[in-house]
């Protein structure tokens, strides 16, 4: 591991002698400058939609000199997104609450990739109108939003206990349907 959302370990990265480091816009600018001062190329991605991801794969393949190998992968990704968009047009939208943590409880807002990915899959982020990347929300706000599915920001193997805590509200459509 060479870092997280807040900071990167410059010494570890330099020791690994990478050909390229991929960052996001919230990486500390001084750390990005420090990497560049060591002659390490840095690519910053700000993927906010599934289409941005395919564009990034294309750009990274170009930077890595593997465009030919990446072309069929990118084409398959774009075809899959087109198929999802077509399928979504004939399906009913599902109201989704994407919970990132519980203390404090926060979710994803409008400018997030997760909101766009949910939309592509036929979901509607119940807090997708909030123009904040990770807004704090209350239990009452979630109950009022009546989500039909509640997602946790982790994989099933590390399922957080707070996801099951929603079972205390059986009137919430997501709980009634077992969509936790």
Question: Predicted regions: what is each one?
Answer:
Residues 1-180:
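N-terminal ligand-binding lobe of clamshell/alpha-beta domains
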């Amino acid at each position: 591991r060479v870092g997280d959302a807040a900071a990167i370990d410059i010494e570890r990265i330099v020791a690994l002698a990478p050909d390229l480091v991929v960052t996001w816009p919230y990486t500390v600018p001084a750390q990005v400058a420090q990497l560049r001062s060591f002659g390490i190329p840095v690519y910053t991605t700000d993927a906010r939609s599934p289409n941005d991801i395919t564009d990034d794969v294309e750009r990274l393949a170009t930077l890595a000199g593997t465009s030919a190998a990446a072309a069929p992968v990118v084409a398959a990704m774009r075809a899959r997104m087109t198929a999802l968009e077509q399928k979504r047009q004939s399906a009913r939208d599902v109201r989704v609450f994407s919970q990132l943590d519980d203390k404090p409880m926060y979710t994803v807002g409008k400018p997030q990739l997760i909101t766009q990915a949910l939309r592509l899959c036929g979901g509607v982020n119940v807090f997708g109108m909030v123009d904040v990347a990770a807004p704090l929300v209350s239990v009452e706000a979630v109950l009022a939003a009546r989500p039909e599915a509640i997602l946790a920001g982790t994989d099933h193997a590390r399922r957080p206990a707070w996801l099951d805590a929603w079972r205390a509200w059986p009137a919430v459509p997501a709980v009634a349907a077992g969509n936790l």
